[in-house]
Amino acid sequence: MVAERTRKAAASGSRGPGELGAPGPGTVALAEQCARLPSPGCCGLLALALCSLALSLLAHFRTAELQARVLRLEAERGEQQMEKAILGRVNQLLDEKWKFYSRRRREAPKMSPGCNCPPGPPGPTGRPGLPGDKGAIGMPGRVGIKGQPGEKGAPGDAGMSIVGPRGPPGQPGTRGFPGFPGPIGLDGRPGHPGPKGEMGLVGPRGQPGPQGQKGEKGQCGEYPHREYPGGMLAALRSNPIMSLKLLPLLNSVRLAPPPVIKRRTFQGEQSQTGIQGPPGPPGPPGPSGPLGHPGLPGPIGPPGLPGPPGPKGDPGIQGYHGRKGERGMPGMPGKHGAKGVPGIAVAGMKGEPGTPGTKGEKGAAGSPGLLGQKGEKGDAGNAIGGGRGEPGPPGLPGPPGPKGEAGVDGQAGPPGQQGDKGQPGAAGEQGPSGPKGAKGEPGKGEMVDYNGSINEALQEIRTLALMGPPGLPGQTGPPGPPGTPGQRGEIGLPGPPGHDGDKGPRGKPGDMGPAGPQGPPGKDGPPGMKGEVGPPGSPGEKGETGQAGPQGLDGPTGEKGEPGDEGRPGATGLPGPIGLPGFTGEKGEAGEKGDPGAEVPGPPGPEGPPGPPGLQGFPGPKGEAGLEGSKGEKGSQGEKGDRGPLGLPGASGLDGRPGPPGTPGPIGVPGPAGPKGERGSKGDPGMTGPTGAAGLPGLHGPPGDKGNRGERGKKGSRGPKGDKGDQGAPGLDAPCPLGEDGLPVQGCWNK
């Protein structure tokens, strides 16, 4: 207490003895400075923002440095690699051009000094030479035209899933909540006419009709002792219109047994005037009998006995699994339940801990309120909180929902395994023979053939005799320039047709074609016999959980329970935060003026020790209401108190949510067969199934008949150059060898 007063005195400045001063400027400045300081949360956010900015700048600088290093390295390496690639390509092109344009060097034939023979005739065509070495890789060609898309390949193997292999199919779930009935569907197609029903009972006799007009005079009847059917037939034959009208009646008279016929008069239709018949013979006058009255209708017969039971039908086909029902609509709000019987006071089950609530935003500071008077101590409350009620029994299963829509087509099945490798095919046909090779080089022979011309031979001998001996062979001259390409030769005569080749092996079976168009629907067949009731189908898949229905109406408020026993006092709470200091009290009255002291200024003495605390003064007047203190921080949670006594049962709670659907009950006894239903309308055609896998290759069939002669083949490409010809026969002596033009070789003239 003393320390607090001392601190207040030091903060507010020195005051005179017995006076109350106003708050000093130091207190106000300190309060304003404390209010302006940022909160710890704001400081933390500011520090986090600065750290993020620094990390972003560091990452940016490091990325720029790394990018510059990569560009510099690419510039150094790129020049060397490009230089090597360009030089290698240039050398390759030069080698190709040099090989193409350079002439083959021909070696001079080794001849003795005394050989003066001209070249012999060309030898026979040599054999085709071996294929040359593989040339270098040519320049990449231009991008070709985009080809047509190929045929669709076989489905690939099933890919590996990242999640894992596909598990086995799950068990069918429990039955879902019944959905609301769907909208009214469109009118279906008109059904086929049903079978003809049984003949109904005889109806009651109708009212007598109005009296008809008098009919025309009929024809003269026959004698009564003649047969009735014969006369009737004669009359019908004479009048065809009457025969058409009375033919059903005549048939019923013929087919009916005699005891069943009852004499009854019918009011017939007005007949047409018949054809005048021939005059009959005069008959004896018959007795004119009185006309009888129409008889009364007979009594209604008893109803017929029920027919024997029909034959037992064939057993029905196993039913398909029911389709998954659509998601049900939210349920309607339940009716207001009646008040329940008060339960027994039993300890309720411990509730599950609730989810922690989100921290609320800081509220605005409120205006300072007036200091209220101290309230009286309240009475101890009664523990009347009821325990949690027991869950209600599960509801009855709802009616089955409407039929769901057709499901989406399933995924395509896994591809089939790869088939076995086929047998090797037969050897192919022999290819066409190549064209004739080019003319070979002149042989080393020394014999000249002049095709039997003696004059030319003698002239050549004279020319050779005048020439001198051959000189020494000169040096090999440089290769001449490449000659101009010769003209294209004439098209040769067509060769003889080749022999027919053997028939090739049978080709592999083609892929299965696409499914054909859907055919027109067939006629409806006659209705089959009714079969037995098939076994009950397996339970369908669990439907999707319906949306939760709206909350039901609040039930009536229960009667107020009796007050419970007095609860135990709770644990002492934590002390509250210290409030702000109150306003300074009013200034007291001035004291009496003291006697003037002696004005002898002495030296200031040292500060003396604090004196003993004085007596506690009288309480001052009640100050004004202080400012409302700020809301203190949330205190730590206290220890859990002891369990209170059992309270009275609470009011009846709201109806709980519907329980989970119960397990399906056992299959009931099959009921009696119901009446035969009408024939349903024909269903829509199903979707076209996927194309099946290619079938196995068929067996090797018998060899087919010999085919017709094929068309004449095209001329083949030019074959390779032939080998060098054989050495020719020895010819006449010549001083100088002759060239291709028939003249001596240059440098070997006889001057």
Swiss-Prot record:
Region spans: Triple-helical region 1 (COL1): 120-223
GO biological process, one term: cell differentiation
InterPro entries named among the record's database cross-references: Collagen, Collagen_Structural_Proteins
Span list, region Nonhelical region 4 (NC4): 734-751
Annotated compartments: Cell membrane; Postsynaptic cell membrane
Region of interest called Triple-helical region 2 (COL2), as start-end residue ranges on this chain: 274-445
Coiled-coil intervals, chain numbering: none
Main subcellular location: membrane
Extracellular topological domain: 60-751
UniProt-recorded name of the protein: Collagen alpha-1(XIII) chain
